[in-house]
Regions:
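Short coil-to-helix segment of the ABC ATPase nucleotide-binding domain corresponding to the Q-loop/switch region
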Residues: 86-93
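Conserved ABC transporter NBD signature motif
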Residues: 57-69
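The feature captures the beta-strand-to-loop junction immediately N-terminal to the Walker
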Residues: 34-36
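Hydrophobic anchor residue at the start of the ABC signature
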Residues: 138
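Conserved signature/switch motifs of ABC ATPase nucleotide-binding domains
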Residues: 123-126, 144
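Helix-to-loop junction immediately C-terminal to a conserved catalytic motif
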Residues: 49
Length: 261
């Protein structure tokens, strides 16, 4: 269980990025975080990762306080950040040095197959397309089998076809060990196709506005009426999260201790 308890973040320049953000995320759950620009999505993700600890409140994984990077938590950024002097296979196996060589090779080979790059094991990062490089980054993050994997808009720089392809590969890899996935995205379609729950954030400072459960079996049909229903629900919530009148009312209820679930 990942528990976020009234997480807040204020920077030295006085910018109040997050306020009293609380949520509980179950092991193996996929959660998407969505909201308007400047609502603190990436700030929240960095606090969960321990890269930029919260100013107030707490982040706890299995009752362990997280205030610095932790071996049980992995993260994928928008840019793949591959090591250019290592082959694709060595990039994927980079975090497995403590494992026996045969176990390491088996995990890397399985991950390469899962992301459709079995024929690229000996290639160099410079020889890959943007989509291929991000597949390697996903495989590299998942082969150490973290309990939690954080994804900060990992597909936003890719074309629509490649983005959908990588979403499918991500779900294939997730199904092997079922870590908790927390995805920051601006893409409503992506949130609905991947997530068990969507957390909609309100801005300035960032707070939880609404939690939407996506009650759809996988694999999900993007053309179904139910899929469209959940997309409309998320879009409506996003619109309301940016409506000043709604925010004022929501802010008053926050002061009284109410929560939106």
């Amino acid at each position: 269980m990942l528990a976020l308890d009234r997480v807040g973040k204020t920077y030295p320049n006085g910018v109040h990025a997050l306020a009293r953000f609380s949520a509980e995320i179950r092991q193996g759950e996929i959660v998407a975080i969505i909201g308007g620009s400047g609502c603190g999505k990436s700030t929240l993700l960095r606090a969960i990762a321990g890269l930029d600890p919260a100013s107030s409140g707490s982040v706890r994984l299995d009752d362990i306080a997280i205030s610095a990077p932790h071996e049980k938590i992995g993260i994928i950024f928008q840019e793949p950040r591959l090591l250019p002097w290592l082959s694709v296979a060595d990039n994927i196996g980079f975090g497995l040095s403590e494992l026996p060589a045969d176990v390491r090779r088996e995990r890397v080979a399985k991950a390469l197959a899962r992301v459709g790059l079995a024929d690229k094991a000996k290639a160099w990062p410079r020889e890959l397309s943007g989509g291929q490089a991000q597949r390697v980054a996903i495989a590299r993050a998942l082969v150490p089998q973290p309990e939690v994997l954080l994804l900060d808009e990992p597909f936003s720089a890719l074309d629509a076809f490649t983005r959908r392809d990588l979403q499918d590969h991500l779900l294939d890899l997730w199904a092997d060990t079922r870590p908790t996935l927390i995805l920051v995205t601006h893409d409503v379609d992506e949130a609905v196709v991947l997530a068990d729950r969507v957390l909609v954030m309100r801005p300035r400072p960032g707070r939880l506005f609404e939690t939407i459960s996506i009650n759809l079996a996988r694999p999900r049909d993007r053309n179904s009426e139910l899929f469209d229903h959940f997309k409309r629900h998320v879009l409506t919530s996003l619109d309301r999260s940016l409506d000043r009148n709604v925010l004022d009312a929501h802010g008053r209820s926050d002061e009284g201790g109410a929560m939106w679930w």
